[in-house]
Structures are given as structure tokens and as C-alpha cells.
Amino acid sequence: MSEASLSTYYTTIYPTKCPPDPRFLVSKEGLAFCCQIIGFISLPMHFFTGYCILMKTPATMKHVKLSLVNLNIWYIISQVIVSFFITSYNFYPSLASFSVGYATALNFPTVVQICILYTINDAVHVSITLLFEIRSSLILKNRFRISSSRGRGYWLAGNFFGTVFITSPVFFNLADQNAEKMKILEAIPCPSKEFFLEPITVFATSGAWNTYLLISRSLKSIYMLQIIFFTSCCIYYLVIVKTDQVSAQTRRIQARSFYGLIIQTLIPAAFTLIPSVLISSRSAPDQLVNNLVSISYAVHIVVGSLAILLVHHPYRLFIKSIFVKSKESVIVPVVSTSMFKVIK
């Protein structure tokens, strides 16, 4: 399919069939503006979270301090990339997108930008999974615990590079872009004008590549399977099986930390799951909803950092100490009026 066919569709069919969409958030400028505002507001919060982790983490949390620092660093990197450099403008439900960030202005190919975005997303997922692994391995009775730093290093490398290699072939096998765009127009006849004017990248979904995408997505769910496994270990050894070798206070502290980790993970996850459910429940695609998904993804990153502060008790106490000052008793001097009496 030639580029002329796509151009002909845009100049002849599109104006008569598709009325202009004046909504600001549908435009690439609206999406970029919202994500940049979120980025400017979020970065100070990320740095404050990093300060709390580095300076206010008590000795009882020393085993998870480095993993929290690691997660915070990847949150910061992800926020900068998503809010400023690679803000993804997606045409759901098709696998077509482009970036409205600064990386496009710097002439980075769209496929390279998407590859970078996927890689950073994988790093965040591995960092979250690492928190569950460490929480599980801190239980000495856990027969599945990773007890050595070398073993944990192999585990981290396998998780990160394994998922990156799984999805890499997709980025190096792009189909005929104009032909794929015409196929998308059959299902979505009235996309936003950016579909025709911007450097859209469409991933191959036909034939064997459709099967490969399904398999690769299934394999990427290994993050969730590992989290479920580590969670099961924690529940089994902290709640179901109780041993006299661990004091009740220690078990209570470990259980509280585990429950906090669950909440810390679920809070930001809700900001991505809810929009995804909203998209899947709609009968017709809406670019406004698509862009709201990208905005919610930018929001969920900073929500992840705030969840660290709100879930862990030492950080909550520090925040409270900033805003709530202890009341100081004010001494008001009392002067006797007898000193001012005039003796007649």
C-alpha cells in the first residue's frame, strides 16, 4: 500500500467523514502539556522520597533500604522520560503510537523511543519484584529464600535481560507501515489528525507475529507470578506456620512490613488498571480516553513514590514532624497592679 493512499484518505475521505475534535486533551499539545505539568510537580516529591529513604530509614529497615533507593531512582528516571522525553500518544486498541516528548524533537526514531520506554518499564517492574523477594528472603525459615548476594544478582539479571530480549524482536521487524495504517483505518476510520501528520510506528500483528506478541506478553507476566510466589511464602511463614525460633514481636514487625509492601504496590497499580479497564469496556475507541491512560501512567509513577512515604511508619512520622509542631507552653508574665497604686 503506497503512501499516496494514506494521503488520499486524509485529504478526501477524512474531512467529510470525520468532524474535527476540539477537545484539548485529544491533541498532542494537550497530552504533552499535562504530562509536563505532572513531571514538574512530581520531581520534588520523588527527591523528597529519596531523602527520606536515605536519611530517615531506621535500623529495623536496613535490609530493604537499598532496594527502596533502587526503586526510587527508577521512579525518577521513569518520571523524567515519560513526562518530558517519551510521552506516548497511543491509538488503542491498535498497536500504533508516537511520542510527543523532546526525544521526537531531537529526531530520535519512534521505534527507538518505544524500546527505551519498555526497557525502563521493565526495570521498574524488576525493582518492585525485588522488594517482594527481599521481604520473602528475610524469613529465615523460608526454604526458597535467596541467601547470597551473588544469587540475587543472577536473579536480577535473568529477570531484566530475559524480558528485554523477549520483546526485542518486535522492534526489529516492522511491517509495511502504510499498509498497517490502512488496516487500522478500517477498524478506526476517524482517528485524531495526528495519525496522519506524525511519525506513527505500527507493530506487526499479523500471522506469526500475532502469536509471538501473545507469547511475549504472557512471558512478561512472570513478574506477577513471582510476586504471587513471594507473597505466598510470606503468608505461609508469617501467618500459617509459626515457630518458637522467632519471637512474636519479630513476626509482628515482619508481617506489618509485608502488609505495607502489598499496599505500597497496589496503590500505584490502581492508577494504571482502572484506565485500562475503562478502555476495554468501551465499544468504540476514543482518543481522549487513550490520552488519559498516558496521563494516568505519568501520575502512577509519582503515586508509587508517595506510597512509599505513606505506607512506612518512620517516613510518616517524619512528615508529621514537619507539619505538626509540638505545642510549647507560653509563659505570660504577670505584673502586680500594686506597684502602680498611688498612696494618698
Curated annotation (Swiss-Prot):
GO terms for cellular component: membrane. The chain crosses the membrane at residues 30-50, 66-86, 110-132, 155-175, 221-241, 259-279, 292-312. It comes from the Eukaryota. This is Serpentine receptor class H-72. Belongs to the nematode receptor-like protein srh family. Keywords: Membrane, Transmembrane, Transmembrane helix. Its main location: membrane. The gene is srh-72. It is a multi-pass membrane protein. It comes from Caenorhabditis elegans. It is found in: Membrane. InterPro entries: 7TM_GPCR_serpentine_rcpt_Srh, Nematode_rcpt-like_serp_H.
